[in-house]
């Protein structure tokens, strides 16, 4: 994942401001949005670094970047470099199911947890130090690295040849395909209900997940329009690579520990 996508949310007036919310506002009025937030957006990890709004070269998405010569606190996760493709594969292959579950649960709850820090916590202290370790790995050389994450509620879905933690509020439907594979279809939860991506789930993995995802409609009908019309609202977090095929994005859940779904 590019470094430009590291900040998926920030702090504004001591509250969480999601990047996808900021992005929607930006594309309604670019200059007004820049003026409103100039100098007001802070790093969500340490709240010591101011962030600026920048537009990607495709003119269809934004990212947040630290002001020049600004410095994160020593333990801030946003100070770290992103883990490499190989480091991510090794980490997620070896992660225990318990830690994986806590990590995915945390990212689904994180927006709430960070809004209300303990009353005795200094706002310049690292926020949620212990929980923040959920998003770090230590490689074989003892170097700590940042685990890349991306909101499903941003304007653009992107390919990724390395493992990324995706999360967000969306609509879900399961299509049962040939050879006992299942496909978790993810749609936007907005007026467009656009098809975001499809996650292939092999039958042996699906069986482990059946209790958690049994509220999601499952049919053998592979028609995308049918899937969208019958989809249900949920919050989801998963870890996968993403490949673009034709006009659709595809991923795969290789282990039950790498998917968490919460019914809304």
Map each language-model feature to its residues.
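N-terminal cysteine/histidine-rich coordination modules
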Residues: 1-109
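Short, solvent-exposed coil/turn linker segments
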Residues: 15-31, 153-156, 202, 218, ...
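Generic recognition of long tandem-repeat/solenoid scaffolds
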Residues: 39-42, 62-66, 180-189, 251
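A broadly conserved detector of short glycine/acidic/proline-rich loop/turn motifs that flank catalytic sites
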Residues: 47, 170, 242
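Short, surface-exposed beta-strand/loop "edge" segments at domain boundaries and coil↔beta transitions
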Residues: 49-50, 71-76, 190-198, 244-250
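Charged linear interaction tracts used for macromolecular binding and regulation
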Residues: 91-234
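OB-fold/S1-family single-stranded nucleic acid-binding modules
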Residues: 228-264
């Amino acid at each position: 994942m590019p470094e430009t996508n590291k900040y998926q949310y920030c702090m504004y007036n001591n509250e969480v401001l999601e990047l996808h919310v900021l992005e929607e506002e930006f594309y309604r009025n670019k200059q007004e949005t820049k003026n409103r937030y100039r100098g007001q957006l802070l790093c969500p990890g340490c709240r010591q670094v101011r962030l600026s709004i920048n537009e990607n070269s495709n003119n269809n998405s934004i990212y947040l970047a630290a002001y020049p010569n600004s410095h994160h606190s020593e333990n801030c996760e946003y100070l770290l470099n992103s883990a490499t493709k190989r480091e991510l594969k090794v980490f997620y292959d070896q992660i225990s199911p318990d830690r994986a579950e806590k990590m995915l649960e945390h990212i689904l709850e994180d927006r709430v947890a960070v809004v209300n820090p303990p009353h005795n916590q200094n706002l310049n202290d690292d926020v949620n130090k212990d929980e923040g370790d959920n998003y770090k790995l230590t490689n074989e050389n003892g170097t700590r690295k940042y685990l890349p994450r991306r909101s499903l509620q941003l304007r653009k879905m992107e390919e990724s040849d390395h493992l990324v933690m995706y999360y967000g509020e969306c609509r879900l439907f399961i299509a049962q395909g040939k050879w006992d594979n299942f496909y978790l279809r993810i749609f936007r939860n907005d007026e467009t209900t656009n098809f975001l991506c499809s996650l292939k789930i092999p039958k042996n993995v699906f069986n482990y997940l059946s209790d958690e995802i049994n509220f999601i409609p499952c049919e053998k009908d592979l028609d995308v329009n049918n899937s969208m019309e019958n989809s249900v609202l949920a919050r989801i977090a998963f870890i996968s690579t993403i490949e673009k095929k034709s006009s659709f994005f595809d991923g795969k859940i290789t282990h039950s520990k790498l998917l968490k779904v919460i019914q809304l």
